[in-house]
Amino acid sequence: MKIAVLGDRDTALGFKLAGAHEVYAFEDTPLEMERLRNKLKELVERGDVGIILITERFAQRVEIPDVTIPIILQVPDKSGSKFGEEALREIVRRAIGVELKR
């Protein structure tokens, strides 16, 4: 299964250098968000993508499908994370089916 990344240019470059299989960079414009929506839909419908990473900023601008596979995770971009501990717990619960508590 492949890992795909959808994000801004800097985030995409970082994940490409880290070895992500497919990396797609977008600008924060309405036209680019439409391209991102189409690419996200395509990646979800393909059978060879297991994980999709999307920057938090872009995830707020598009509808994230509620699917089990591929796992869709939001990652921070260069401006930092907007997630709190509770949101991270929910991501882990959806990804592995177990709720983590302190």
Swiss-Prot record:
Record keywords: Ion transport included?
yes
Q: Which UniProt keywords apply?
A: ATP synthesis, Cell membrane, Hydrogen ion transport, Ion transport, Membrane, Transport
Q: Which residues cross the membrane?
A: none
* Annotated membrane topology: Peripheral membrane protein
Q: Where in the cell is it found?
A: Cell membrane
Q: What does this protein do?
A: Component of the A-type ATP synthase that produces ATP from ADP in the presence of a proton gradient across the membrane.
Self-association or partners: how does it assemble?
Answer: Has multiple subunits with at least A(3), B(3), C, D, E, F, H, I and proteolipid K(x).
Q: What is this protein called?
A: A-type ATP synthase subunit F
Which gene carries the instructions for this protein? atpF
